[in-house]
Amino acid sequence: MDKQDEKKQGTTKSSSTLTTRCSHGNHISQSNSIPLDITIEILSRLPAKSIVRSRSVSKLWSSITTTPEFIKHRSKKTSPPCVLLIFRKHDKLIVFSSPQHQNTYSHVQDYHIEIPKNGFIRRLDSVHGLICLEGSKQLVICNPTLKRFFPLPEPQGTGDEYNVGGFLGYEPIEGKYKALCIVRGWNTQVLTLEIQESWRVTKPGYTHWPTKDTGRCINGVIYYKAIIFDRVPRHVIFGFDLRYEEFTHIEFPMRNYDRFLMVSYEGRLALISSTSSVVEIWSLEDAGNRKWSYEQFHLCLPPNTSLKGVIDAGELIYTGFSLNRSFCVVYFDPKKNNIRETKFQGIADNQIWQPDRLGFDLVNDFYVLPNHIESFISF
């Protein structure tokens, strides 16, 4: 075989193609072959709903769209971050999604997700497209894009009663999801998702228990409020580095820490407190030296609004305490001293408005998750 023929053969072998066949009675005709990379490109350009549906249409498409290569490729084409408004009603999560940079009126997309048995909500946050729910003895991962739940293995030493607290994190350098679990306050364990492995025991240095507040994953570190059971119990902020799997703890920069919401602000850990007229922001400037900075801003908000979070652009998110015919979300930019509103259409017509024997509580049954992105990952 000469070099030219060898080159042609090598080219043929390295070229992956997708061949489709059409059957008419006993006659089978072969259509033009579609290169695999073109198929991936076509599928990656589809809307999220279409990609999810394609998995049930074709086994080949299902295998393609579940590979790490496709998921990584699709993430580069993902839609802009959105804000999720999640209402819990009985065993359902009613989820509304809308672009968080849209002004005036926004028509929301909504869908319902059945909560698995023994799954309940105490802390809720969107971590790189996934949401973590706490079960009685295990953690459950929810992918809103796929509308699916993925129960994690039960941690070691859970016993018969509820004693599990946990958080989900994303390590951006290695691109890995990890779950952190605290069992009975002294047994801390970590699990790498996507890998068939068991929980690994870690040592935080202190016996502690997370508070009911939501944790935050910022630049590969899970931060959460906790109580250290030392000689005198005290409240601190724990940090868990996902890459090196090491713990640190940080003292609060103020005494009245209960009224401060822990968020990611300008890419850093921050504690924010807000009334209708004043916003206070403590930002962790230097985690190694425990150095905080303090800022105060004045604003004029509508009455009966509550701070729910911060979007990546630095705007603070507020919502009301009641459901009106046009549900409104208020955004405040402290740096620009600018306020904008988005009124959501479609929420008033949803079944959360239907009469309910148990009623509905916007304080305990309503969650706002900013900076949510699409994810096609499954476990």
Swiss-Prot record:
Residues 1-26 are annotated as: Disordered. CDD domains: F-box_AtFBW1-like. Residues 28-74 form the F-box domain. Residues 11-26 have a biased composition (Polar residues). It comes from the Eukaryota. This is F-box protein At5g18160.
